């Protein structure tokens, strides 16, 4: 049986709360660098559009974007331009002003899935983020099945087990 090498780039970035355009520029550069280095999959940090931590819900809400906002739209365009799969976290502004700690998986076809972090740690659930309630999604991609979770979700074995049982 032959092995297929898949290059995955995990981007560690210093992002600043309140600097949306600066954050997008840093992420854009990291994605382009990863593509030039041969990556097929690019993984961005949690809350890559906003940086992290927030003073209060007002600061968070001001920085959050809808799913079809400029950050996710740009990631989808970059995925198409470079032939990548991009998984990235963003502060999602939902209906009624609710804010979710979300992640998307995008590729050349656009947004394939969105996941809202279910397991919030103390500071996140203290009047900041609304928890998601769906199980982590698993998506068929050009490189195989990819599951999407965010940070603290990984500390819950049954959560990880569902993704593994679904083939990720």
Segments from the language model and where they lie:
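Aromatic/hydrophobic pocket-lining residues that form the small-molecule binding cavity
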Residues: 27, 72, 156
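Residue-level recognition of beta-strand->loop/alpha-helix junctions
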Residues: 12-14, 45, 116
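Residue-level preference for short coil/turn positions at secondary-structure junctions
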Residues: 2-4, 37-38, 80-82, 99, ...
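N-terminal active-site segment of His-dependent metallophosphoesterases
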Residues: 1-40
């Amino acid at each position: 049986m032959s092995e297929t090498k898949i290059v995955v780039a995990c981007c560690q970035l210093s992002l600043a709360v309140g600097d949306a355009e600066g954050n997008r520029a840093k992420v854009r550069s990291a994605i382009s660098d990863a593509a030039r280095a041969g990556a097929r999959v690019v993984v961005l940090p949690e809350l890559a559009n906003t940086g992290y931590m927030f003073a209060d819900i007002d600061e968070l809400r001001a920085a959050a974007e809808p799913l079809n906002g400029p950050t996710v739209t740009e990631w989808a365009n970059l995925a198409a331009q470079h032939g990548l799969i991009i998984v990235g976290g963003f502060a999602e502004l939902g209906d009624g002003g609710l804010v979710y700690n979300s992640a998307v998986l995008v590729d050349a076809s656009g947004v394939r899935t969105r996941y809202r972090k279910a397991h919030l740690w103390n500071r996140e659930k203290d009047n900041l983020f609304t928890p998601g309630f769906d199980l982590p999604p698993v998506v068929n991609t050009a490189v195989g099945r990819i599951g999407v979770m965010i940070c603290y979700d990984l500390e819950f074995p049954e959560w990880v087990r569902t993704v593994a049982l679904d083939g990720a």
